């Protein structure tokens, strides 16, 4: 991410996280005049474990990526309320920020505009697709499908969704290959 945005790399041994998930609970704002962030950021995986976080925050020009030290004054880890099943053992909760010093990373909107963002999103979509295929497998193997019209209809819906998703992922992969 830092290389995509023409920023200096973090020091060797620095453990970093990217907290860019948004939702109604996300109230984090960057104040350009003071160079600080304030508000809440949900779904911060690795909170309490990492040294540095790259965090998306709202600002006057939309959204902006900032870099901050996670042990800075004003950083408060909320009790974990969300348990990321795929990352058991990694704390993932809301972090509250109160006028925490933050350095802008790139221009406003640059995090979402960089090519690597869409490449990463495609990888996540492929993972979700793989999970959907695995979830559909028992239905596809079920002997009920032969004798149960409703089960056969549901399997047809599942197959259509999986096939259209696969087609979109192939199209996305071709676009990424053409636009690295």
What do the predicted segments below correspond to?
Residues 14, 24, 49-51, 62, ...:
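A generic structural signal for well-ordered coil/turn residues at beta-strand boundaries
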Residues 1-5, 133-141, 174:
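Short glycine/serine- and small hydrophobic-enriched flexible loop segments
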Residues 34-38, 77, 95-99:
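Generic recognition of long tandem-repeat/solenoid scaffolds
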Residues 1-49:
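Glycine-rich flavin
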Residues 166-180:
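C-terminal helix-coil-helix/basic helical segment that borders enzyme active sites and/or dimer interfaces
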């Amino acid at each position: 991410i830092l290389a995509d945005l023409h920023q200096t790399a973090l020091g060797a041994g620095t453990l970093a996280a990217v907290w860019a998930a948004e939702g109604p609970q996300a109230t984090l704002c960057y104040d350009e005049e003071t160079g600080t962030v304030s508000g809440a950021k949900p779904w911060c995986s690795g909170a309490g474990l990492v040294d540095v976080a790259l965090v998306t925050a709202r600002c006057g020009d939309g959204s902006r990526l900032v870099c901050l030290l996670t042990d800075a004054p004003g950083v408060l880890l909320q009790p974990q309320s969300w348990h990321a099943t795929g990352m058991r053992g990694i704390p993932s909760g809301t972090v509250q920020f109160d006028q925490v010093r933050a350095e802008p990373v790139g221009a406003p909107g640059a995090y979402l505009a960089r090519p690597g963002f869409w490449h990463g999103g495609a990888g996540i979509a492929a993972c979700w697709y793989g999970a959907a295929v695995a979830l559909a497998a028992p239905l596809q193997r079920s002997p009920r499908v032969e004798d149960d019209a409703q089960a056969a209809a549901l399997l047809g819906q599942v197959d259509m969704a999986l096939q259209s998703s696969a087609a979109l992922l192939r199209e996305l992969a071709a676009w990424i290959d053409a636009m690295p």
